[in-house]
């Protein structure tokens, strides 16, 4: 099968099962797996939308403990004996009584060959309706606060009618608003400079009285009983009260001197929000949505002092360990994040500020709980408003497209072991026969808690081969390795759902089996390696991570490229490997690994989003797409992400996922400024100027978070966003005859892709020669 046909096949599998694998044939021994360099791994999107898939309204049929695998199309079913054999543990299980009428031609949906992904609605109802607690920073300008209030009031109409809503505001003090008290505005005030233990918060709010016990089901349509009902009200009953409270919110009254920052107790407000939910709603779906317009400057978790002369920490400060508040703040927010994750609650962080707000310190609140992270210049921006509204997108049945209190478990056959997960989750510390010896990401477990999950939430799951090799390793007949992903989550409709995806792939034959190399998915592999690199970058030095990326690339090319000794020009890669070095070139230059010109908050935001998206979107972040428009061609033409693509008579459309940029070449910009497009006879120029705008609108239509939209001309200051992403094949040092500077010239010392590839070929051939010499003359 040729590469294009394989790509189509992998794309069909992704549409059906929401999964892409780095290798689509598994090596049969651990030794063979170690020589692959790129680990066996999957990018899995559990809730990928499948509108044509039925929702089964009965409990799944599971294997006996401890296996607990769910019945799937790969199970052997004996319809006469009414038994099925589990493909994971090979145990025989009786079919339940309601399967008595099945025959070879009439089988239940979960056994259909195309039902490798199936969803069940479980009988267990959710313990409470979805909960939304808005935590609002009042230390901001009037116009920003008004815009935020308007957006929050609008969001009330997007919530399910039975959803519970609470409100906490903070500035110098944190206030929990008692929405259930209608006589006048009433709130409980917490001092911003003091750290409160969980029990203190509960005592002060009067939450220790008998309330709904954890995991005790309530009617999903009924308001909660108990003390928390004073602070959390159903939208349908209290929309008027909640709207009134929001409308009456005022700026923090505490005076701020010109040389000071506002006193902002973000840590106390978050601590109170977590304490409020964990007392009465353990393991019930809830979101704490934080809206902050500046850094925390007092109390636990503060990231900078109130004096403006004291700057926010930079990457340089962190590298030199010149960070006064960083470690203590991280410890505080990480402890809060673990509490929220253990209770199944999501924390979303929405920042509306030109300066840093402390996202770096707070990042694990979102990373541990599956929350959203959004970085915008102001709450007045359309980027914030439209992105926030998209959080509440709904399906065809008017249910929110978000899952609550989610968990993921992975089962494997004896050939495979799970080594870990990289994504927005925490370990459930569940041990089983599927857990591997090594660790990659969040390891030593086969189950993780994600809390918040949506249709684009994706996770990198990594595996190892269990078989050590030897004569007994290769067994006669076709062999396969299997994995099953079990995603439990609270659906917005009020029931728990289970989505099951079962994947089977063939095992390779003896060493040197060509099907192994042919099964390599370079796009999935690039994204999975990028996740590992970003995971390493959070704990290691940047240059060390880039060296690791380079080493892995050299090893992969040494293993799979064709070349002759001492002849770099003979270097060749198969079609399904050719783009991989290019992806790695752009990854090592990207904002995920290069922190220069980005604040620590921006770096935390970019890495957060990369770890949330599937293969297609993550690849756009690593290697942006570039399209060209000109009068010679109709529509857009994909072009190389290279400085040579800049032409005076062309318009370029760059998509980096975070930015959508329209770039006008010099001549086009001059024509536009002269107004030719408005004159008769120049309709083709007008259409040319409009085409990239229409394509940009399509790109923006369903993207979260909403990208920043930039229109610029050659030589303009905003053109730097384009130039920073292009391969610098034409720089000030490689100019043509006379050394003249053109619009294609990029002033940089970065190496070009061609130089990178030349060095790669030399290293690969040298490494191969060195390995051969070492084998011939082993070191003593």
Curated annotation (Swiss-Prot):
The keyword Protein transport applies. Zn(2+) binds at residues 63, 67, 86, 89. One of its GO terms (cellular component) is endoplasmic reticulum membrane. It comes from the Eukaryota. Its main location: cytoplasm. One of its GO terms (molecular function) is GTPase activator activity. The COPII coat is composed of at least 5 proteins: the sec23/24 complex, the sec13/31 complex, and the protein sar1. This is Protein transport protein sec23. It comes from Aspergillus fumigatus (strain ATCC MYA-4609 / CBS 101355 / FGSC A1100 / Af293) (Neosartorya fumigata). The lineage of its organism: Eukaryota, Fungi, Dikarya, Ascomycota, Pezizomycotina. The gene is sec23.
């Amino acid at each position: 099968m040729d590469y294009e046909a394989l790509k189509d096949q992998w794309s069909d599998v992704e549409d059906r099962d929401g999964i892409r694998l780095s290798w689509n044939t598994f090596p049969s021994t651990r030794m063979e797996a170690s020589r692959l360099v790129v680990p066996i791994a999957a990018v899995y999107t559990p809730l990928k939308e499948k509108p044509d898939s039925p929702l089964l309204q009965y409990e799944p049929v599971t294997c006996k403990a401890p296996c607990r695998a769910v019945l799937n199309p790969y199970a052997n079913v004996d319809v006469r004996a009414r038994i099925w054999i589990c493909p994971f543990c090979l145990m025989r299980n009786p079919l339940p009584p309601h399967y008595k009428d099945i025959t070879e031609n009439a089988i239940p949906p979960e056994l259909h060959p195309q039902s490798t992904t199936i969803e069940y609605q479980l009988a267990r109802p959710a313990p409470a309706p979805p909960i939304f607690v808005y935590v609002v920073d009042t230390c901001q300008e009037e116009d920003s606060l008004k815009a935020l209030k308007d957006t929050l009031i609008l969001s009330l109409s997007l919530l399910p009618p039975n959803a519970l809503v609470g409100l906490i505001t903070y500035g110098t003090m944190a206030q929990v608003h008692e929405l259930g008290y209608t006589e006048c505005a009433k709130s409980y005030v917490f001092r911003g400079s003091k750290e409160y233990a969980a029990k203190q918060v509960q005592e002060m709010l009067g939450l220790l009285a008998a309330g709904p016990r954890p995991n005790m089901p309530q009617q999903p349509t009924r308001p909660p009983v108990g003390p928390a009902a004073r602070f959390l009200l159903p939208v349908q009953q209290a929309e008027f009260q909640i709207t009134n409270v929001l409308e009456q919110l005022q700026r923090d009254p505490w005076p701020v001197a010109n040389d000071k920052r506002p006193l902002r107790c973000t840590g106390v407000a978050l601590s109170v929000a977590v304490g409020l939910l964990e007392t009465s709603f353990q393991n019930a779906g809830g979101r704490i949505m934080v809206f902050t317009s500046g850094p925390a400057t007092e109390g636990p978790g503060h990231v900078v002092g109130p004096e403006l002369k004291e700057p926010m920490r930079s990457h340089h400060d962190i590298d030199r360990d010149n960070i006064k508040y960083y470690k203590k703040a991280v410890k505080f927010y990480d402890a809060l994040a673990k509490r929220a994750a253990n209770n199944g609650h999501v924390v979303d962080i929405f920042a509306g500020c030109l300066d840093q707000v402390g996202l770096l310190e707070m990042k694990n609140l979102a990373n541990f709980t599956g929350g959203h992270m959004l970085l915008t210049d102001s709450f007045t921006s359309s980027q914030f408003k439209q992105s926030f509204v998209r959080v509440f997108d709904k399906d065809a049945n008017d249910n929110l497209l978000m899952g609550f209190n989610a968990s993921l478990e992975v089962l494997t056959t004896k050939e495979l072991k799970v080594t870990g997960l990289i994504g927005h989750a925490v370990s459930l510390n569940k041990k089983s026969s599927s857990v591997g010896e090594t660790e990659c990401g969040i390891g030593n477990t086969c189950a993780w808690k994600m809390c918040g999950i949506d249709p684009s939430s994706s996770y990198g799951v990594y595996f190892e081969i269990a078989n050590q090799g030897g004569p007994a390793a290769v067994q006669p007949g076709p062999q396969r390795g299997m994995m099953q992903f079990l995603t439990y989550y609270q659906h917005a409709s009020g029931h728990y759902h289970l989505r099951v995806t079962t994947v089977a792939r063939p095992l390779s034959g003896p060493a040197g089996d060509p099907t192994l190399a042919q099964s390599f998915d370079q796009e999935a592999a690039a994204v999975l390696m990028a996740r590992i690199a970003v995971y390493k970058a959070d704990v290691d030095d940047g240059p060390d991570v880039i060296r690791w990326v380079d080493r892995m690339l050299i090893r992969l090319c040494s293993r799979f490229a064709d070349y002759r000794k001492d002849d770099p020009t003979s270097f060749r890669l198969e079609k399904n490997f050719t783009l991989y070095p290019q992806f790695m070139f752009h990854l090592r230059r990207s904002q995920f690994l290069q922190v220069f010109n980005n604040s620590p908050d921006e770096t935390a935001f970019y890495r957060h989003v990369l770890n949330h998206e599937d293969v297609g979107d993550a690849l756009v972040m690593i290697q942006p797409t570039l399209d060209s428009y000109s009068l010679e061609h109709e529509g857009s033409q994909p072009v190389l992400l290279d400085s040579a693509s800049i032409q005076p008579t062309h318009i370029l459309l760059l998509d980096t996922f975070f930015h959508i940029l329209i770039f006008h070449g010099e001549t086009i910009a001059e024509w536009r400024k002269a107004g030719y497009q408005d004159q008769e006879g120049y309709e083709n120029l007008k259409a040319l100027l409009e085409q990239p705008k229409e394509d940009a609108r399509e790109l923006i239509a369903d993207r979260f978070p909403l990208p920043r939209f930039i229109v610029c001309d050659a030589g303009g200051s905003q053109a730097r966003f384009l130039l920073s992403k292009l391969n610098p094949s034409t720089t000030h040092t490689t100019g043509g005859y006379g050394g003249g500077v053109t619009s294609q010239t990029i002033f940089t010392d970065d190496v070009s892709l061609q130089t990178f590839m030349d060095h790669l070929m030399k290293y690969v051939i040298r490494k191969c020669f060195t390995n051969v010499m070492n084998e011939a003359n082993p070191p003593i």
